Each structure stands twice: as structure tokens, then as C-alpha cells.
A protein has these predicted regions:
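Conserved Class I SAM-dependent methyltransferase catalytic core
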Residues: 46-98, 115
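Conserved SAM/SAH-binding loop
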Residues: 16-20
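Phosphate- and divalent-cation-binding pockets in alpha/beta enzyme and binding domains
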Residues: 21, 67, 71-75, 218, ...
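Class I S-adenosyl-L-methionine
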Residues: 25-34, 43, 82-254
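Active-site beta-alpha loop architecture of Rossmann-like, nucleotide-cofactor-dependent enzymes
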Residues: 39
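Beta-strand-turn-beta hairpins that frame and shape the catalytic cleft
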Residues: 4-13
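Active-site beta-strand/loop signature of hydrolases that rely on acidic residues for catalysis
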Residues: 34-35, 65
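Arg/Lys-rich, low-complexity, intrinsically disordered N-terminal tails that contact nucleic acids
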Residues: 1-5, 252
Length: 254
């Protein structure tokens, strides 16, 4: 494989088709973050790249894949043939919907499904914790002390805001279209928990269809290493400039 298009601070970008670049890397990874074309339009960039599931399966046994239910159903055979087994999925709730069909409910979500190969015990699956748990305690009324007047004892009410809880399967992450460099760019707020689930601290991630390389930005934020592959040289250049700007705080969710 040729030298990386970009390399710096635990991140590499390779220019090319992932089906050709992946076998040439000669490396394995803790997990993959994949955002393939959904095939929902007739646009050239939205065509499903046949064979990518097998190519990814040769370098990792754990994968998060974004998509729509229609996409997963239409290409189910490719996942099966590559010996990927479905673990579970999460729903990414978006602030802006897609689709303009007047006879269908406006879709404001996408799916991210987790797939694995081999033994479940051999892949990382550490459920992230969020600090937004809420505990409410309300003491019951005491027994009526005066049936005529209906007098009751005092009550107390307490609530604790914040605290740890396991991440739930619906994740809200807003898109900032004004700052995005790619039309299907994923927010860091959806990528970060997926990475924390499937990749141990200091571990490695492969993104075979990287686009804006948001996976690489999220990897830096969480202390992981990332290799990104992108077929569009113009997008590689934009992503490289973005990575050269350094890690932005999580408030920048795009």
C-alpha cells in the first residue's frame, strides 16, 4: 500500500477503495466504524460497494455500521456471507429529517447496528455510562388521622439530578450542517459512545469509508487510534485540514 495521505497524532488517512487498501495494510483493528452508501438514491456516490463487508471482516471482528432498515434488509446476504452476526442496534435521533415523500412519516432517525464475528467473549463490549441519571423519592402519605376532616400526615419529596446510568439505545445527536464538510457527516456525539463501547482505551479503529473523518476526530477525543480510508481525494484533503486543526471539544458535535 502507498504511504498515508495524512498521518499525525494517532491518525492516518489512506486514499483509495477500501476493498483494495484494507488487505494491503497488513493490520488488524479492535473495531470498525462504517458508514456505507445506503443506496437510497440514484446518485453515483450512493451506490452500495459490493464486497466491503468481507474486506472489513478480514481486519476486525467487531463493527458498528450506520444505515437504514431498508439498506440492511436489501444487503443482509452480504453480512451473512462475511460471517457477521448482529449483536444489537441503536437509534440515532437527529434534529433534521430526510426524505420528502408526502405519503410517508418523516424520518428523523438512522440506525447504527453492531456486528461481530467469532466468539462474543473475544470482542470488546463495554457499555458507556452517561451522567444524567435521575433519582426521585417521594414518601407516601401517612394514614388518615381524622376521617372527618381528611387530615393526613406530611410528605417529603426528594430528587437527585445527575449521576451514572448505562447508555440507552436511543441517542440524540444534532447535526451542524453549517460546519460540516461532508453531506452525510456524522456528529461526534453519536460516534463517541459507539467507539467507547467497541474499542478499549488506547485501541485501534478502522473506518473504511471515512468521508469527513469524524471517526478520527472522535478517536482522538477518546484516546484511541484511527485509520481512515477515503476514495475521494478532495475529501481526503478537507479531512486532513480538519485534523490539522486539532481536537475540538465535544460541544462541537459535528
Amino acid at each position: 500500500v502507498s504511504a498515508p495521505y495524512y498521518s499525525g497524532d494517532s491518525v492516518e488517512i489512506y486514499l483509495g477503495d477500501c476493498r483494495e487498501v484494507l488487505p494491503a495494510l497488513g493490520r488488524t483493528f479492535d473495531a470498525a466504524i462504517c458508514d456505507p452508501p445506503y443506496g437510497s438514491t440514484s446518485l453515483a456516490w450512493d451506490r452500495w460497494p459490493t464486497g466491503w463487508t468481507q474486506a472489513v471482516g478480514r481486519v476486525t471482528d467487531s463493527m458498528w455500521c450506520f444505515g437504514s432498515l431498508r439498506m440492511f434488509m436489501a444487503n443482509a446476504a452480504e453480512f451473512t456471507q462475511a460471517e457477521w452476526r448482529l449483536s444489537h442496534d441503536v437509534v440515532w435521533e437527529k434534529n433534521k429529517g430526510a426524505g420528502f415523500h408526502v405519503d410517508r412519516i418523516r424520518r428523523v432517525h438512522e440506525l447504527a447496528s453492531h456486528w461481530y464475528r467469532g466468539a462474543w467473549a473475544d470482542v470488546c463490549h463495554e457499555v458507556p455510562v452517561t451522567m444524567d441519571a435521575r433519582r426521585h423519592r417521594r414518601d407516601r402519605f401517612s394514614a388518615a388521622s381524622d376521617e372527618i376532616h381528611g387530615a393526613r400526615g406530611a410528605r417529603n419529596y426528594e430528587t437527585d439530578e445527575g449521576g451514572p446510568r448505562m447508555l440507552t439505545s436511543v441517542i440524540r445527536a444534532w447535526i451542524k450542517h453549517g460546519s460540516a464538510i461532508h453531506p452525510t457527516q456524522k456528529p461526534l456525539a453519536i460516534l463517541t459512545p459507539l467507539i467507547e463501547y467497541a474499542v478499549p482505551p488506547g485501541g485501534s479503529i478502522i473506518d473504511p469509508m471515512a468521508g469527513s473523518c469524524s471517526t478520527a476526530v472522535a478517536a482522538r477525543l477518546t484516546g484511541r487510534r484511527a485509520v481512515c480510508i477515503e476514495a475521494d481525494e478532495a475529501m481526503c484533503e478537507k479531512a486532513a485540514r480538519r485534523l490539522d486543526q486539532g481536537v475540538l471539544p465535544m460541544g462541537d458535535v459535528s
